[in-house]
From Swiss-Prot:
ATP binds at residue 268. InterPro entries: Cys-tRNA-ligase, Cys-tRNA-synt_Ia_DALR, Cys-tRNA/MSH_ligase, CysS_C, Rossmann-like_a/b/a_fold, tRNA-synt_1_cat_dom, tRNAsynth_Ia_anticodon-bd. Binds 1 zinc ion per subunit. Zn(2+) binds at residues 27, 208, 233, 237. The keyword ATP-binding applies. The lineage of its organism: Bacteria, Pseudomonadati, Thermodesulfobacteriota, Desulfovibrionia, Desulfovibrionales. SMART domains: DALR_2. GO terms for cellular component: cytosol. The gene is cysS. GO terms for molecular function: ATP binding; cysteine-tRNA ligase activity; zinc ion binding. Keywords: Aminoacyl-tRNA synthetase, ATP-binding, Cytoplasm, Ligase, Metal-binding, Nucleotide-binding, Protein biosynthesis, Zinc. Monomer. This is Cysteine--tRNA ligase. Pfam families: CysS_C, DALR_2, tRNA-synt_1e. It comes from Lawsonia intracellularis (strain PHE/MN1-00).
Length: 485
């Protein structure tokens, strides 16, 4: 297993610090609003990582925190006349609901910032005692960035380079513009806690330092998050933590790429902010999950409804293949003969390549390419009349079903009952495309009657009318079957 380490700017073999065990910490959401697709991507990326590592036999402890005290949470609480705790709890619960729908496994430990205030105060005290931090006249506590010689090692830039073109919160009380807040002095209308230097609340960065140190013996094997967290959040985490413990915060740093919308940065100001639960009103959860797996996790991914529609078509092809295999396996008796050895070898080779792709920095994009090769191979077997009903054919289909079972374990896709999924897919596409089912059924009835009367011209006219409505027709032994183009 090799992973790209942001710190070293290269892929490295994953070697656990504690034999057989892995500690993974990923920065979670700030709980002030519903989760967007950027949150979903990060959650799914690290869900795949954890699934893969457990499949390989590692004892994984997966930690994902919640920031439940922050300016944005406080602002929303004040605006809505609620407490910060109520706001945070609402959106933590909403996050869990959304991730459950997307098939994201629960983290083993989910620390909330407000449960670790004493640990954060202790971190601040240690930094003050080491002269790595200072208290201002107003009661804020700041970290001295230049007291940490390695500051900038994650982003690969020096402190002076980081000052250029970076939005820095100004303060006349700072010794250096790059210094960042560890503790914010209490303000009216804000939650606050007692500390040796007065009431206040923690800064964002110290939260993760305290929680990660408390939840796993440092260094972590892997620390992860979105690429937008490299600076300042992860850079500041490193400076704080390593100034306290005098050893690395993490061995490997992993960062997923951002989500764009129609090739533009996703932001509320551009009006292209995509909330997970809004998308799931129009698409099945597995479609969004599958869409987010189609690009390598370190690359940006461009969200579009056209891309989601193409993902649906790909899903449909896979589930239709699974349904046909399941139907073939319903046979009560099988003929002897057939020749499956070459097909089985092809399936084994493609699944081995699928696994190699995942083990090469979680390359789901390449892995899915091999999965579609497997679908193509099985399609050939389904069309091979000399093989279809034989015992060798049964072996091929059972092998395929075992591969799909493993794909579901590893990627969390294609594990549903195929006919149920295909019906759900048809239903949500009917709703999304505002298809009048009664109109479709009336036209199908007219076409059926025209075919019975051998009026094929009229039958073709009805087919064309249905096509103009976005409906395709297939004539089967069981009658007309319609679906959405």
């Amino acid at each position: 297993m090799h992973l790209y380490n942001t710190m070293e700017k290269k892929k490295e073999p994953l070697i656990p610090i504690i034999s057989g065990k892995l500690g993974i910490y990923v920065c979670g959401i700030t709980a002030y609003d519903f989760s967007h697709i950027g949150h979903a991507r990060s959650a799914i990326v690290f869900d795949i990582l954890v699934r893969l590592l457990r499949y390989q036999g590692y004892d994984v402890t997966f930690i994902r925190n919640f920031t439940d005290i922050d300016d944005k949470i406080i602002n929303r609480a004040n605006k809505e006349g609620r407490s910060s705790k109520e706001v945070a709890e609402e959106f933590i619960n909403a996050f869990h609901e959304d991730m459950d729908r997307l098939g994201v496994l629960n983290a083993d430990i989910e620390p909330k910032a407000t449960d670790y205030i004493p640990e954060m105060i202790e971190c601040c005290q240690k930094l003050l005692e080491a002269d790595k931090a200072y208290i201002t006249a107003s009661g804020d506590v700041y970290f001295r960035v230049r007291s940490f010689p390695d500051y900038g090692k994650l982003s690969g830039r020096t402190p002076d380079e980081l000052r250029i073109g970076v939005r820095i919160v100004p303060s006349e009380e700072k010794e250096d513009p790059l210094d960042f807040v560890l503790w914010k002095a209490a303000k009216p209308g804000e939650p606050s806690w007692e500390s040796p230097w007065g009431r206040g609340r923690p800064g964002w960065h110290i939260e993760c330092s305290a929680m990660s140190e408390k939840c796993w013996p440092l260094p972590l094997d892997i620390h992860g998050g979105g690429i937008d967290l490299i600076f300042p959040h992860h850079e500041n985490e490193i400076a704080q933590t390593e100034s306290i413990v005098n050893k690395p915060l993490a061995k490997i740093w992993m960062h997923n790429g951002l989500v764009q919308v129609n090739s533009e940065k996703m932001s509320k100001s551009l009006g292209n902010f995509k909330i997970v639960r809004d998308i799931l009103e129009a698409y099945l959860p597995e479609t969004l999950r599958f869409f987010l797996l189609k690009k390598h996790y370190r690359s940006p991914i461009d969200f579009s409804f056209e891309g989601m529609n193409e993902t649906e078509r790909s899903q449909k092809r896979v589930y239709e293949c699974i349904a046909e295999v399941d139907k073939a396996l319903e046979r009560k008796s099988w003929d002897s003969g057939g020749s499956s050895s070459s097909i089985l070898a092809e399936l084994d080779e493609q699944f081995s390549l699928f696994m190699s792709a995942l083990e090469d920095d979680c390359n789901t994009a390449a892995g899915l390419g091999h999965l579609f090769n497997i679908i193509h191979i099985v399609r050939r077997a389904l069309d091979d009349k000399a093989l279809y009903s034989t015992t060798d054919g049964k072996v091929v289909f059972e092998q395929f079903r075992e591969i799909i079972r493993k794909v579901d374990i590893l990627l969390g896709v294609f594990g549903q009952k195929p006919n149920s999924f295909l019906q759900d897919l048809k239903t949500i596409r009917i709703i999304r495309n505002k298809i009048d089912v009664n109109q479709v059924e009336e036209l199908l009835s007219k076409r059926r009657q025209a075919r019975e009367e051998k009026n094929f011209v009229q039958a073709d006219e009805v087919r064309n009318t249905l096509a103009s409505l976005g409906i395709e027709i297939r004539d089967t032994s069981e009658g007309q079957v319609w679906d959405i183009l």
